[in-house]
């Protein structure tokens, strides 16, 4: 294998698309907090100082979507009218209806739920980082989280909510990360901050603490390459739910079936099966059965079991792949109801997933990030 490079990006919680993801998942959580069986499919669009929320919700919860949206926007940091978008003055329109009875016909099938839609879903894990995530997306998220911490903590008081990061990692001929070739940080900032202060602050509070050990003299470091990023967030760009799929998942290091996560309850396999696929793949790698693992699942609307369960290990497996695939099928529940129960997805936990990635965040209490099936998996494999 020849050496190659991989580039992944991340965005902060104030990015317009992420604002939408968090509003959609905030509304989902508000429903689940009162009604764990709520059916929710909510999309959000933000543009300028306007928010449009649309979708289908069937629930017994007493929902105030407008209030929830304003709370999310304020928590992100858009509370000042000077930003051009703020929680107090933004205009919010809603168009929320109940779930189509034709869809419900396929989902509500007695004790065992059917899939809310068809889809192909992928989960991935590798041994490049402690969280078993690819190194590029791990670094990119780390930089974005440092930006957010520096803003919320007042370390860099001139930071504003919007921001993006990107890293390029070079891999050696054996597929191991060997060098960081490029780091890009673009962050919204107050009008009055001078460039020298901005660059020094980002280097000292964001870049060095996160990837300092990877920096070499030849590493290319770019901070606000255009020179100015004052207008940002929804005041600068329109945002829509579900437009940061690679940021949400593996930074382009694994396949993606195309279905977004945010705003969808757990009967939607776009979300639930992607989480279960990650859970399975992560346990395979944690068990030492492969260095890299991708689990693929496919579902038909109304059916409770998958049409396909496939395991790809890219030649890094330590046991026969057919044997490993059989063990994955036996160890993990892939029915819709089984996945919901195993991952405890009736809880209001989803807003936490809506920024900085759905995977690799082991301190958030997500069941799909646990490696608690390693022993069971190895036992089924006869190890």
Swiss-Prot record:
Region of interest (Flexible loop), residue spans: 99-109
Source organism, top-level taxon: Bacteria
Residues where Mg(2+) binds: 17
Family, similarity comment: Belongs to the AdoMet synthase family.
Binding site residues for K(+): 43
EC number: 2.5.1.6
Source lineage: Bacteria, Pseudomonadati, Pseudomonadota, Alphaproteobacteria, Rhodospirillales
Name this protein carries in UniProt: S-adenosylmethionine synthase 1
UniProt-listed InterPro entries: ADOMET_SYNTHASE_CS (IPR022631), S-AdoMet_synt_C (IPR022630), S-AdoMet_synt_central (IPR022629), S-AdoMet_synt_N (IPR022628), S-AdoMet_synthetase (IPR002133), S-AdoMet_synthetase_sfam (IPR022636)
Keywords: ATP-binding, Cytoplasm, Magnesium, Metal-binding, Nucleotide-binding, One-carbon metabolism, Potassium, Transferase
Signal peptide: none
Annotated residues for binding of L-methionine: 56, 99, 237, 268
Gene source species: Rhodospirillum rubrum (strain ATCC 11170 / ATH 1.1.1 / DSM 467 / LMG 4362 / NCIMB 8255 / S1)
Reactions catalysed, as given in the entry: L-methionine + ATP + H2O = S-adenosyl-L-methionine + phosphate + diphosphate
GO molecular-function term, one example from the UniProt record: magnesium ion binding
Binding-site residues, ATP: 15, 162-164, 228-229, 237, 243-244, 260, 264
PROSITE patterns reported in the protein's UniProt record: ADOMET_SYNTHASE_1 (PS00376), ADOMET_SYNTHASE_2 (PS00377)
């Amino acid at each position: 294998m020849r050496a190659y490079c991989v580039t992944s990006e991340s965005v902060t919680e104030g990015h317009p698309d992420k604002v939408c993801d968090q509003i959609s998942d905030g509304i989902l959580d508000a429903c689940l907090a009162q009604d764990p069986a709520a059916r929710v499919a909510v999309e959000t669009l933000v543009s300028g100082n306007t928010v449009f929320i649309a979708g289908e919700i069937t629930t017994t919860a007493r929902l105030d979507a407008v209030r929830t949206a304003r709370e999310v926007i304020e928590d992100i940091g858009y509370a000042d009218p000077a930003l051009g978008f703020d929680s107090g003055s933004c205009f919010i329109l809603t168009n929320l209806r109940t779930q189509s009875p034709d869809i419900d016909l396929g989902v509500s099938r007695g004790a065992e739920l059917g899939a809310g839609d068809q889809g192909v879903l992928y989960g991935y894990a590798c041994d490049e980082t402690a969280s078993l995530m690819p190194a590029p997306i791990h670094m990119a998220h780390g930089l974005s989280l440092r930006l957010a911490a520096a803003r919320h903590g007042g370390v860099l008081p001139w930071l504003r909510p919007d921001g993006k990061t990107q890293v390029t990692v070079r891999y050696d001929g054996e597929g191991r990360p060997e060098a960081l070739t490029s780091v890009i940080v673009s962050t919204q900032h107050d009008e009055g901050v001078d460039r020298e202060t901005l660059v020094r602050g980002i280097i000292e509070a964001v870049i060095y603490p996160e990837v300092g050990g990877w920096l070499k003299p030849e590493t290319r470091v770019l901070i606000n390459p255009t020179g100015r990023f004052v207008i940002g967030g929804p005041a600068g760009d329109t945002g829509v739910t579900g437009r940061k799929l690679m940021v949400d998942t593996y930074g382009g290091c694994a396949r993606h079936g195309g279905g977004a996560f945010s705003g969808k309850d757990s009967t939607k396999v776009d979300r639930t099966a992607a989480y279960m696929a990650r859970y399975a793949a992560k346990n395979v790698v944690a068990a030492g059965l492969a260095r890299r693992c991708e689990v693929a699942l496919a579902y038909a609307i109304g059916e409770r079991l998958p049409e396909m369960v496939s395991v790809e290990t890219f030649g890094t497996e330590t046991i026969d792949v057919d044997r490993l695939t059989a063990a994955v099928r036996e160890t993990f529940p892939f029915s819709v109801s089984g996945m919901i129960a195993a991952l405890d997805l009736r809880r209001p936990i989803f807003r936490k997933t809506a920024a900085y990635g759905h995977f690799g965040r082991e301190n958030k209490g997500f069941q799909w990030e646990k490696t608690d099936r390693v022993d069971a998996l190895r036992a089924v494999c006869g190890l």
